[in-house]
Structures are given as structure tokens and as C-alpha cells.
Amino acid sequence: MDSLIIEEEDEEALATLVPVPPRRKTHSYSLQFDHKPHHQIRKHSLDEVPRSATLASEAVYFDSSDDEFSTGGNITENAADETNAGAEEYTIVNPPPNVGLGDDDTEPLPEFIGAGGGSGIFKVPVRAAVHPGRPPCLELRPHPLRETQTGRFLRNIACTETQLWAGQENGIRFWNLEDAYEAGCGIGGQVPRGDEDTAPFHESVTTSPTMCLVADQSNKLLWSGHKDGKIRAWKMDQSSVSHDDDDSDPFKERVSWLAHRGPVNSIVISSYGDMWSCSEGGVIKIWPWDTLEKSLLLKPEEKHMAALLVERSAIDLRSQVTVNGTCSISSSEVKFLLADSVRAKVWAVQSLSFSIWDARSKDLLKVLNVDGQVENRGDLPPIQDQQVDDEMKLKFFSASKREKPQGFLQRSRNAIMGAAGAVRRVATRSAGAFSEDTRKTEAIVLAVDGTIWTGSISGLIVQWDGNGNRLRDVNHHHRPVLCFCTFGDRIYVGYASGYIQVLDLDGKLISSWVSHNEPVIKLAAGGGFIFSLATHGGVRGWYVTSPGPLDNIIRTELSQKETLYARQDNVRILIGTWNVGQGRASHDALMSWLGSVTSDVGIVAVGLQEVEMGAGFLAMSAAKETVGLEGSAVGQWWIDAIGKALDEKNTFERMGSRQLAGLLISLWARKDIRTHVGDLDVAAVPCGFGRAIGNKGGVGLRIRVYDRIMCFVNCHLAAHLEAVNRRNADFNHIFRLMVFSRGQNLSNAAAAGVSTSAYTTKSNTIPSTGAEEIKSDLAAADMVAFFGDFNYRLFGITYDEARDFISQRSFDWLRERDQLRAEMKVGKVFQGMREALITFPPTYKFERNRSGLGGYDSGEKKRIPAWCDRVIYRDTQSSPFSESNLQCPVVSSVIMYEACMDVTESDHKPVRCKFHATIAHVDKSVRRQELGKIIRSNEKILSIFEDLRFVPETSVSTNNIVLQSQDTVILTITNNSPTSQAIFNILCGGQAVVKDDGEDADYNPRGSFGLPRWLEVSPAAGIINPEGSVDVKVHHEDFYSMEEYVDGIPQNWWCEDTRDKEAILMVNIRGSCSTTLRSHSVKVRHCFSARVCLLENRPTNLTKNLGGSRRYPTDITRNGSTRPRTEDSVRRGKSR
């Protein structure tokens, strides 16, 4: 090999150069060395590394089947007797069903159970038929396996009172909420893979990936923005569009056009019904409603003409605020838009700044940064990424020409320590790079009281007033905020940790729970639910009453129906571990080890150690890890060779692998269970040379099997007889710090429009607090298997004595001398985990290519044989005799634990362990149906839903308002309820031109019930306290017709619209948690006395008396508004 090989002696010498705790001055002895009848072996132990009580690691949201995990609950203490340390302590675990029935070779083996498994992160996770730690939910779309969603991931959602729409990578889909509790189509149904248990839905034709959605309920349209720069309109009522009986045909868009050169990041509809969209390069465009309306009236076969009509009407705001080449807004990407319907403004959100625009005049009002400071100039230089240090590029292995020649140890030490230092520097540099990222805005929402709330990557939530003044900061969770939504007087926050939090309007925390096992990327309210979408594509509906009495009723009722939706499946798992000593194996050796025992196996996990070693390789591996690269040609050779032995072309399918320096783990699943296996994630934790190099450490794979989570971890722990405490510390370090990579999920997050920096922000850049942050990924799994070269040796025994006992196959006494068993017995390592009875000879150390038990090391060192290569695991059993059910979903037993003594290619023997696992899981389609039956029939639940229909009694000061030019009238809304707040918002149900012949006018709504341009209403939404009132200004603003735009240029701006017009205002009233509303109708009429007035130039300031017009004398009201003395049609309401 080209790289330098580190032999065991050299490794020991190098270890003395590593900054680790010094050796003790006096010899110390572990409990395992007490009462030895043979020659005492001194244990030159390192100082015991203390285990920290807590660990600020990435928030754990991986919760098994994504709905049964809870971090709370009591677990039965470990069954192992810790007081009797000297006796054989093996426990026969209750065999799962269908095991050992008349077939002796499948009888479960006795197992030893380690102490200390009943507390902290080593506690068995709590499971239940219905999650005990969060509100029950409607599983509209259960978590699909990631592998089934390639090219089809859900990106975003939008909701109305009757439908939920979702944007996908390949189109649009929607659910009718009246069908939300219906059964899915099941496996083999006419639905794509991953949607077998999804409630009935409808899909569109294939489109470019969907970036954003907005619902226009006034015109029954759903608008979508796409990655190809197009905006599409979809009819909400697809039944009226379809002309055949086949409801499964994909539906088509009503109209579409090319809106941007880049992806359409966000769409909103302003208070005046115009559509605003944004994209890269700071581009914001407005699409006037009048043009959109005309395009929608064209026939489907005229869609090209409709697209051209809309495209030519665009108003580019960036060009309008650019003067002499200087733009008032930044050229960075506009990520979000927010329509402030209270004050008729639009907020445009860039990463570190906001711009606020007037929705009516389209003027730029203010530009401010995320700290609330007003910025006076745009086009700020983009933030430059930190450059990699030159030494990172050049100094992994190079030495100065002036240096004296160095020996092997010094050169190896320089290379490896240089790489370790590089890893630490990159980690520190990355933390600095994230310091700016943590301020970036990731979400924005308008609350019912008119305040604006924004969330950042750091978890900071900021409240703003409508003018961009920063009011308060709150921070209840130190993970990135990804989305908001509001319902009533509550604000819902979705985090990258999978948490949902509920806040009041003062920012105080009401409730919090883990909603998904992956980031919550979108929230939407409608139909009495708060719907959440996770990056994996799962959609859940949370009742708006949660947390509340409804939760306990549903949880109790649904738990009692467990037998109706509980299912069980069995799977056999083969685990193989081998320290290959930098060699390669023949096909016959691999067949002997693995291929010969896989006929009944569903999953195969293989771990190799010392695939490659040497200072050069370790340094290169560390360098590659810092830039996200892993693996090697030798590692790939091993994966291919093992795959060939498993017949992966016909029988097994390779799921994934992970390599860290010399450590390699890979996993295969049998093809006939492939539809139930997926969501593979990877992890690596280095433990060698300052916890930075992978010559020692662990690599892991996490996978979902029948909706349960299994973790497989391949380890290579510290070497040498005396390093027991270092081995214990290595295990503790791996168990606590193993965070499974979202490497495969990053593509999902990007597809979903989630900021990569938000998604990858880790605990080393953002502090973590609270018990919810302490759980590790491994602690949250249903089954965890550790295997590898653990390096625990036999103590208190000589080489010759060990050889004698081995030759006599007297393993009972040798097991008493096993360091690992002694450490597990006192709860120092592998706490609460189990190992089958060892009945094979020690697997280390052998002379290569020498068969039989005579092959043990006979060289000068004569290393004492030892069981270095082991397989240890835990499942969800809290006692040795648990049965598989939804409270204990994974029950496993070992039916084979062997070493392949005939394989001689390495100084270690390969070990294999076969498990039989019984897995209990939920049929989520059936459970959703049972939930629907409970919701429709339970009297207490129906009573709670009826209470949600309560709306406070309110009144308005008038139902008719008449305005003339520049008039302002006060509309008073009064809340007559003595106890309840009333939430109001004012929309325009339609506008019309008054006909001269007295016929009824045709009222047409603008986009999203927007106001006509001649009318201003302020405030258009808000909260009215009990027995209080609010004054709303209804103001007429002279409007010059600017409806027709060609390439953004007004074509007839010199004409004033002189026709009398009417608008119907809808004053909608809700309670603080109402699912229904009441509406007051107010007719507003504008009378124009002068019929025609042609002006040569558009006036900058409108005069009170236009030429030829007749004006009434006016009064100045206490609010500064004007009102004709002779007009009695409006009654001023009393202000309170």
C-alpha cells in the first residue's frame, strides 16, 4: 500500500503524542480485576473519562413510526442482577411467535443483560397505540418512505375551509376535507408508491416543481408558482371542469404564463386583488387583477393569448425604484412576500432585510434590516463566504524542505495530527460562518391584531408593527423557525426540529409538541385543523382546540380500538462483523461467512474494520470528511464483493453504506420486503487522535422497517488490554454524539424550499436548552445493534491458560474473565443492552492463512486470545418476557451467534449474529377511519365542535355609506359580548359600476376579495375587546384608470374614471377560536358629480374642487376625517 501502515506498537507510540489525559502515577485496578485466582495483570489504565449528565446535541425528532414515541414515561429497570457480579448471569428471553416451533436450530439463545439501562438516554423509549405526549391528529398522509418520493416530494400546502392543496415536485394535488377520514387505496391500489395509506386525493398533470401556493377563495382559484418561472391557476371545483366520469384523470391548469426567469419563490394577493410575485436577483413583479380577470375569461383554446396578455401587463418594481443605476432594494433573492391586509401593504423578505410597499400606489415605503434599522441604500455587497485556509489546501502531508529528515513515528504523527487540527479548524470556521446565517429570516406571518411576526434560523421570533418597528423578541426553542400560520388569536410556529409551538399574541408559549420526525416546512389553517407538512412529505391535521379536553377524549377512545388497527410482521436480521486487517477476502470466505446463512433473512447489515489504515489514508479521509466526502475504492470493492455473495442482483437490494476511514457499514434488504424498508440515514463519529480521526470510532445506519426505526452501528474501540476506560469512553462518545446525517434528506429539504443553512444548523453553533434537546438519535430508536471490534480483552489470565481453556472449549470460565461482560455488569458500558451467550472461541488474534485453533498468535508477543468481535443490541423490551404490541413494538431474540473459524484472511475471525424480530405497527388507514367514526359519533366531541361555532354578537354603525371625492367616513364595529373578544376583517364581496338605467349592478369580486382601487379601509382587520368598539376609516381616493399595462407601462393613465361605483364590504366576525363566522354587509357607493374631466397631465396633488364639480361644505371630525353636512345616510357610532 502507498500509505504508511501503523502497527499496534507504532499506534501505542503515537498515542503518547496525542493530547489525552496522562497515565496514572500509580497502577489502578478496575472491579473486574478483583479476586483473581491467577497471575495478577496490572492495568495501566487511563483516567476514567466522566460521562456528562447532559449533552447539547441536535434536537431529537426521530420518533420511530413518527407517532408512537414519547420521551416521557417510566421504564422497568434492567432485569440483570447487579449485586451478584461473580456468577453466570444469563437470561432466557421469551421467544417471539413462530420461533423454535419444532426446529432446534432456531431456538433463541440465552442472553446477558447489561446493567444501567433504566435511566437517562439508555432508557427504553416509550411507545403507545396513540402518542401520549402530543395531541391526537388526523394522519391525512402518513410518512412515506423517502425512496418512494424521488421527484414527487411535497413542497408546500395551502388550505381553504373545504380543501387542502399541496404543491409537489411534479405537480399539484388536493384533498377534499369531507373525505379526510376515508381509507387509502392500499398496496396495489391505483396510487403512486408511498400513498397507499393516504386519504383520497386528486392529482394534476405533470408540471415543473411547485415552489409556492396561494388560495383565492373569491374566484375559487388556486395559484401556484413553479421552478420554471411559471405561475399557474387551477380551478378549485374540479368537478365542474371534468367532462367525463373518470375522476382519476389528472386535472389541468386554467391558465399559465412565464412570470420570472428564475423560480417563483412566493406569491401573494394584495388588499387590492393584485398578484405579487418574487424571484432571484431581488425581482418583484405585480400582475394587475384586471388583466388576470380578462385572461381567465378567455377560452381554454386561447391560453396562449391569455399568457401573452398577462406577461405584457407585468409591473417590475425593481426597475421602478432604480434611479441612475442605483436601486433602493438589494439584489439578493427575495424569499417571501407577505400581504398586510390590515394596512394594505406588502412586505418583501430577503435574507437579512425587508422592504415595505404600498399595495395601492405600489410605492416603496421603507427598507430595513433584520435588526429594525432603516437602510438608506440597496445593492449591498453579498456576504462573502469564508475562504479555506491555505494550510487546509497544502499542509496535510507536506513538510518544509528545511526540516531535517524525520522517522516513521514522527512523520505519521505529523500527518495525522495535522489532519485532526484541520478538522477542528474547519469545524470552528463553520461555526463562524453560521453566525451570520442565524440572523436570516426563514418565515413571516401576519397576526390578527395586525402585528407582523418573523422567525430566523437561530429560533428567534421577532414581532413588528405595520410600519416596520421592532416591538419584541421571543425565543422558546433554539432550532430554526421554518414556518408560521395563525388561527384566531393563536400563532403556530413550525421548527426544523419537528416541533410545533403555539404562542399567544404577546409571544408567550401556550403549548409545544413534536409533530413530525423531520422539519416542519409548512403550516396551514382550515376546516378546523392546523395542517403541518414535514420534509418527508407526511401531512397531519391538528385540531384547533389542541391542547384541550378533546385530546384526552380522542386518545382514550382511539386507544381502546387498538386491536382493530394493530398489525404484526416478522423479519430475520443478519449482522456480520469482521476486522479485515487491510486485506481482502475470497468469494468462498464471504459465502462461508454470510452467503450460506441468508436463505431466511430479510435484512443484512455488515460492518468491517481496518478496511484501510495508515497515516496517509487516515489524514486523507479526515480531509475528505471536512468537505462532505467519504468512501474509498477499497471500501467499494468490499461492498461489491459482499453484494455478490448475497446475490444482490436477484435476491437482495443494496440500501446504503457509510465509510469513515477504515470503518465501513453497509445494509441490504430482501426484495420481497423492500416496500416496507427505507428512509436510510447515515452517521459517523470519530474517536481516534483527539476525537477527530476515524482510525477508531463508529459508523451507523438508521432505517425504517415496517414503520419502526432500527439503528445499526459498526464500532472500532480503543485497543490494548489496559485501555478499558478508553473503550468505555469511546462507546459513550459514540452513543451520545451519533447524529444521523440528513445528507439524503438535504435534497428533500432543498426540494421543499427549505434553506440548507436552516436545515443543517447544528448544536455547535446554536446553544440547546431543555430536556427535549438531550435525547440522542440512538436512544429514540426501536432497535439498536452495536457490532464491531470492541477490543475488550480477557483479564487475569495468561496466554497459555487461555489456550488450554480454548482447546478444551471451556468457555464458561473464560467468560468470567471477559472485560466487556464485567464492565456491562456494573453498568459502565452498553447500558441495558443484551448479548447472546458466547459459545465460540475467541476471535483474536490469529496468524493469517493458518486454520484451526492452532492459529492463535504464537509470535514474540503472544497476545492473549480475546472475544474482540461482538454483537450487542437492545429492542423495546423493558423486561425479558415482553410480548410484541404497540406498547412494545419490537421484540427480538438471537437465534444464531457464531464465529467463522475457517476464514483465515485476517488476524480476526468474522462473526455473524442472526436475529428474529417481531414488529408491531399501525395500519394508519384503518386507524384514520376509526378516528372518523369517533369524531362523528362521540357526543362529547360533537359538543366541543358545536362550541367552536360560537361567534360574539356584534353590530355595525351603518349598512350604507355614500362617498364623494376624498371623503372619509367612520364605520364603527361594536362587540356586544360581555366576555368574548371579537376578531374582525373587512373584505370586498364585489364591485360594480352603477348603471344609468337603474338596473341591478353586476358585482364582480377582485382577487381574494380585494378592495377596489378607489376605496381605502383602515384598519381592515383587528380585535375588539368585550363590550368595546373600533372605528374603521372608509375613505375614497380619486383614482385614475391605470388598468391597462403593456410591458409595465400605463397606457391610459390620463383618464379619470368618472362613473358612479358601488362596492359591497363584508365585515366578517369570528371569535378567538371560532370555526365559523358571521358577516355584516355594508354597501359603499361613490357618486361622481362631474362626468368627464380630461387632464393634460396627471396632477400630483388632487384639489378639493375639481373644475365643474359641486362640493358640499365639510366638517372636520374628531378623527380628522371629513363628512358632508347634508349627508345623513351614515350614522357615526360611539367610540369606546
From Swiss-Prot:
Disrupted gene: resulting phenotype?
A: Defect in development of the cotyledon veins. Altered auxin homeostasis and reduced abscisic acid sensitivity. Shortened hypocotyls and expanded cotyledons in response to blue light irradiation. Precocious pollen germination within anthers. Elevated sensitivity to gravistimulation in root gravitropic responses.
Keyword entries, A-Z = Hydrolase, Isopeptide bond, Magnesium, Metal-binding, Nucleus, Repeat, Ubl conjugation, WD repeat
Q: What is its EC number?
A: 3.1.3.56
Top-rank taxon, per record: Eukaryota
Required co-factor?
Mg(2+)
GO CC, alphabetical: nucleus
| Region annotated Catalytic 1, chain positions | 782-798
Swiss-Prot/TrEMBL induction comment = By abscisic acid, wounding and at a lower level, by cold and salt treatment. Down-regulated by blue light irradiation.
GO molecular function annotations of the record: inositol-1,4,5-trisphosphate 5-phosphatase activity; metal ion binding
Give the family this protein belongs to, as stated in its UniProt record: Belongs to the inositol polyphosphate 5-phosphatase family.
Its biological function? Converts inositol 1,4,5-trisphosphate (Ins(1,4,5)P3) to inositol 1,4-bisphosphate. Modulates cotyledon vein development through regulating auxin homeostasis. Involved in blue light responses. Decreases the amount of KIN10 degraded by the proteasome under low nutrient conditions. Participates with IP5P12 in the control of Ins(1,4,5)P3/Ca(2+) levels that is crucial for maintaining pollen dormancy and regulating early germination of pollen. May modulate auxin transport by regulating vesicle trafficking and thereby plays a role in root gravitropism.
Q: How would you summarize the oligomeric state and partners of this protein?
A: Interacts with KIN10, but not with PHOT1.
The entry's protein name is Type I inositol polyphosphate 5-phosphatase 13
> Which organism's genome codes for this protein?
Arabidopsis thaliana
